[in-house]
Swiss-Prot record:
GO molecular function: 5-(carboxyamino)imidazole ribonucleotide synthase activity; ATP binding; metal ion binding; phosphoribosylaminoimidazole carboxylase activity
Functional pathway: Purine metabolism; IMP biosynthesis via de novo pathway; 5-amino-1-(5-phospho-D-ribosyl)imidazole-4-carboxylate from 5-amino-1-(5-phospho-D-ribosyl)imidazole (N5-CAIR route): step 1/2
Domain of life: Bacteria
UniProt cross-references to Gene3D superfamilies, sorted A to Z: 3.40.50.20, ATP-grasp fold, A domain, ATP-grasp fold, B domain
HAMAP family registered for this protein in UniProt: PurK
InterPro entries registered for this protein in UniProt: ATP-grasp, ATP-grasp_carboxylate-amine, ATP_grasp_subdomain_1, PreATP-grasp_dom_sf, PurK, PurK_C, PurT/PurK_preATP-grasp, Rudment_hybrid_motif
Purpose of the protein: Catalyzes the ATP-dependent conversion of 5-aminoimidazole ribonucleotide (AIR) and HCO(3)(-) to N5-carboxyaminoimidazole ribonucleotide (N5-CAIR).
Assembly: Homodimer.
UniProtKB keywords: ATP-binding, Ligase, Nucleotide-binding, Purine biosynthesis
Protein name, as recorded: N5-carboxyaminoimidazole ribonucleotide synthase
Native organism: Vibrio parahaemolyticus serotype O3:K6 (strain RIMD 2210633)
Family per record: Belongs to the PurK/PurT family.
Length: 377
């Protein structure tokens, strides 16, 4: 089997690594240059989307923000999975909110803003405090505002108006502020036959709006809620592939915050912690193969490496520590790689995370150090 991935970043890279044992070949389409590249070496293999489509058995995507004309060409080939509707929902918060409402899935009260009058109506409908997010292009905390009090209205509107004017068809989605206890996510896969397999929930810690630490957790009641909502969303889209739902945990009740129609950062722990990793299961799904087991085989946490291209060599000598570099050029705040930390018996993962904190810079890895502090109390 030969799969073309729209996008040539780290997710395509990790799909390639996961596909090799199954004899699934991966090529990546660089949306910016129009080149088809090898996802590991970035060697140019060809140019032009139409030629690439003819040479593969299936097409999928590693991110949501893909030009619609590219998606439409892929959809016409009959080889693209999941559907373009799913990708577009992940790339436009207006479509995403409508999808969640239509699927009957709990999410925060919301209102779409295109004009100053809409902003006033949103304040009346949603209330203050509220969170405001750009409908298009926002991710990892970008394109977001928090309206905490009426005194901020004029300043925030000026910034949002500039955002709306800068991009055709842009809008802002106002959401009710949700006082959540923690953020969790569910990554799962749906096959061509409608079968569903979900991984254990992961508890997520963000730093400046970017995921920094993700840990698989055992929470049966939350797991049941999350799986029900995952299935509702996936079935409504007739989804094929890996899908991620991000939730707010509000006193034991889950509300969907966002969906991601692709393999997801909070699922990277599955590379060492699950029977079948998310990347392999995505390829299994889009290639029409049976889904693999999502069973937890060891307690695992994932630590993002942000803006750094080196780590202390001591990590390589640590038991249960697995480093995954993405081969990227160093840039401040950029996701350069991740560390998976595993434990084989109760308490071992906590001990190893505390050991990790002793060798990692607290300014670069604050979430790991905060975890260690909490563990010592």
């Amino acid at each position: 089997m030969h799969v073309l991935v729209l996008g040539s970043g780290q997710l395509a890279r990790m799909m390639s690594l996961a596909g090799a044992p199954l004899n699934i070949q991966i090529s990546a389409y660089d949306v910016g240059s129009g080149n088809v590249v090898h996802p590991l070496t970035q060697q140019v293999l060809g140019h032009g989307l139409e030629n690439a489509i003819e040479q593969v058995d299936a097409i999928t995507a590693e991110f949501e923000h893909i030009p619609h004309d590219v998606l439409d060409i892929c959809e016409l080939s009959g080889k693209f999975l999941p559907s373009t509707a799913a990708i577009k929902a992940g790339g436009d918060r207006r479509v995403e909110k409508a999808l969640l409402d239509n699927a009957g899935v709990r999410n925060a009260k919301h209102y779409v803003i295109e004009t100053r009058e809409d902003f006033e109506r949103a304040i009346e409908h949603v209330g203050i405090p509220m969170v405001l997010k750009s409908a298009l292009g926002g991710y990892d905390g970008k394109g977001q505002w928090r309206l905490k009090e009426a005194a901020q209205i004029e300043t925030i509107w000026a910034e949002m108006a500039e955002c709306i004017a800068a991009t055709p068809t842009q809008a802002i989605v106002a959401e009710e502020f949700v006082p959540f206890n923690r953020e969790v996510s569910l990554v799962g896969a749906r096959g061509k036959d409608g079968s569903v397999e979900v991984y254990p929930l992961a508890e997520n810690v963000h730093t400046n709006g970017v995921l920094s630490l993700s840990t698989a957790i055992d929470a049966p009641e939350l797991q049941a809620q999350a799986k029900q909502m995952f299935t509702a969303v996936a079935d409504s889209l007739n989804y094929v592939g890996v899908l991620a739902l991000e939730f707010f945990d509000v006193e034991g009740t889950l509300l969907v915050n966002e969906i991601a129609p692709r393999v997801h950062n909070s699922g990277h722990w599955t590379q060492q912690g699950a029977e079948t990793c998310q990347f392999e299961n995505h390829l299994r799904a889009v290639c029409g193969l049976p889904l693999g087991s999502t069973k937890l085989i060891r307690e695992t946490s994932m630590v993002n490496i942000l803006g750094e291209d080196t780590l202390p060599e001591a990590l390589l000598a640590m038991d249960g520590c697995h480093i995954h570099w993405y081969g990227k050029e160093k840039r401040e705040g950029r996701k350069m790689g991740h560390i998976n930390v595993c434990g084989d018996y109760p308490g071992e993962l906590h001990r190893r995370l505390c050991a990790l904190a002793e060798v990692l810079d607290p300014m670069i890895f604050p979430a790991v150090h905060e975890f260690a502090k909490q563990a010592q109390r």
